[in-house]
A protein has these predicted regions:
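A short alpha-helix/helix-coil micro-patch that ends at or immediately precedes a cysteine
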Residues: 1-37
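Short, solvent-exposed loop/turn elements at domain surfaces
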Residues: 11, 36, 41, 77, ...
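Flexible, active-site-adjacent loop/turn segments at secondary-structure boundaries
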Residues: 17, 21, 39, 51, ...
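Short, surface-exposed glycine/acidic/tryptophan-bearing loops
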Residues: 24-72
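Disulfide-stabilized extracellular recognition modules
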Residues: 60, 68-144
């Protein structure tokens, strides 16, 4: 899934993301929750994205999530997501970190999850050193 994310971002002149272990674990957990027998297909499963991320130790400022089911490959899933304005915005957004999950239900249905985020800035929250995005930029992105 990382290669698909990178490919779609590169096509728009955007840099590749780095995989974050917490985002990866949370996305995999989400895919497995969605693939469980009788589970609803919703971002609210497991208490919702913010709760799942916090439970796994996420300390980031910004986060976004994509989910899908029924596609057999990551490539098909990214084509579907790129056709949806909200999912597309997450893929092409400013988050610098990512994590992906994939699970297959008992009936053979594929479930896909992507979590995107950026670590909280250091140094007082007025700008983010070390190449991090200033806090105010995340507020603008959230508000869009």
């Amino acid at each position: 899934m990382l290669s698909e994310d990178t490919r779609h971002r590169a096509a728009k002149g955007l840099s590749a993301r780095s995989v974050d272990a917490t985002l990866q674990a949370t996305a995999q957990q989400l895919a497995e929750l969605l693939a469980a027998p009788g589970a609803p297909f919703t971002h609210a499963i497991g208490g919702g994205m913010e709760r799942r991320l916090a439970a796994n130790g996420w300390k980031g400022m910004a986060s976004a999530e994509n989910i899908a089911y029924g596609n057999d490959t990551a490539a098909e899933t990214f084509v579907q997501w790129m056709g949806s304005p909200g999912h597309r915005a997450n893929i092409l957004g400013d988050c610098s970190l990512c994590g992906f999950g994939h699970a297959v239900s008992r009936d053979g249905t594929h479930y896909w999850a992507a979590n995107y985020g950026t670590k909280a800035p250091t140094g007082g929250g007025t700008g983010g050193g070390g190449g991090r995005v200033p806090w105010w930029r995340w507020v603008l992105n959230w508000w869009r």
